[in-house]
Design a protein with these regions (language model features):
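Cofactor-binding loops of NAD(P)H-dependent oxidoreductases
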Residues: 49
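A hydrophobic C-terminal alpha-helical subdomain
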Residues: 224-284
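Oxidoreductase cofactor-interface core, primarily capturing Rossmann-like NAD(P)-dependent enzymes
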Residues: 1-41, 52-55, 59-66, 73-76, ...
């Protein structure tokens, strides 16, 4: 069996895809710029490659028919890198953006959305079998957004606390990816992936508190206050995108889909289950 190549395997979803493929006994090859930063199963093969330098991708692509792609490079690298990859493979599963999710949270124009659309168009024109994954809000964002405040014992200060989302566990995204990478029947399919519940951001923080066994103090920030507090830690385009999306989605429940169950036959994991599995990230 030829290995499956994972491009972008150092991130939250890529690591889970690598782990779940290895658990199934599927050989994997992980392409990354910095091999020293990788820590995977010994079953994995590691190859150095940089999407911004397409000529470095050839060694990783040797003997590869199937690729899982998480784009982790500047937009300027899209065309030359994808041309190099797509001319050598037969199947690609791309972790895209929720471009077609019928909800205001995902309909705000932004750079990430435009980049995802560009990549999809190039893949579609290549003639390869493709599958696009469109996850909504990632449950692991909670660690980035609220982890430090919760660990420190401070109040969780956050904007748009009553805006609902349907956070999805990274294990469920990976489970869908693994099916699409290893089974037939997923060519030219687009899967919208969400968690099983519409939960306000306030409710998500309260669930984390419940898992930790303590009541968390929560304070609402205005959009202006949030911008000032978030900009030191997050890029301006990300902050702008999030604030605009939360504002647009503040008056209606989150979109909850059935993509995970449809592909895997199992229900998506709840946010409570995710928080329980990641409780250590919120403890001192």
């Amino acid at each position: 069996m030829n290995p499956i190549l994972i491009i972008g395997g150092t991130g939250t979803v890529g690591r889970q895809v690598a782990y779940q493929l290895s658990e199934r006994g599927v050989p994997i090859r992980v392409l990354a710029r910095n091999l020293e930063a990788l820590s995977f199963s010994r079953q994995a093969e590691f190859v150095r490659g940089d999407l911004t330098q397409p000529e470095t991708l050839d060694a990783g692509l040797d003997g590869i028919e199937t690729v899982f792609l998480v784009w982790v490079a500047p937009p300027v690298a899209v065309v030359p890198a994808l041309e190099r990859v797509l001319r050598k493979i037969r199947r690609i599963v791309f972790l895209s953006a929720p471009l077609k999710t019928p909800h205001p949270l995902f309909q705000q124009p932004n750079a990430a959305r435009n980049l995802g659309l560009q990549i999809e168009q190039i893949i579609e024109a290549s003639g390869c079998d493709w599958t696009f994954l469109r996850p909504g809000m990632f449950a692991p964002n909670a660690k980035e957004w609220w982890g430090e405040q919760i660990r420190s014992g401070k109040a969780v200060r956050w904007p748009y606390l009553d805006t609902p989302t349907a956070p999805i566990d990274e294990r469920d995204i990976a489970a869908v990816a693994v099916r699409a990478l290893t089974e037939n029947g997923h060519a030219r399919m687009e899967y919208v992936l969400t968690g099983p519940q519409s939960l306000t951001q306030r409710e998500q923080i309260e669930i984390i508190g419940k898992v930790l066994g303590r009541s968390l103090q929560i304070e609402e920030l205005s959009p202006e206050e949030a911008r000032r507090e978030l900009l030191p830690d997050f890029p301006r385009p990300v902050v702008d995108m999030l604030l605009e999306a939360w504002a647009a989605a503040s008056c209606q429940p989150a979109f909850v889909g059935t993509g995970v169950r449809h592909v895997t036959g199992q229900p998506a994991r709840s946010f409570f289950e995710w928080a329980t599995n990641n409780a250590a990230a919120f403890r001192t």
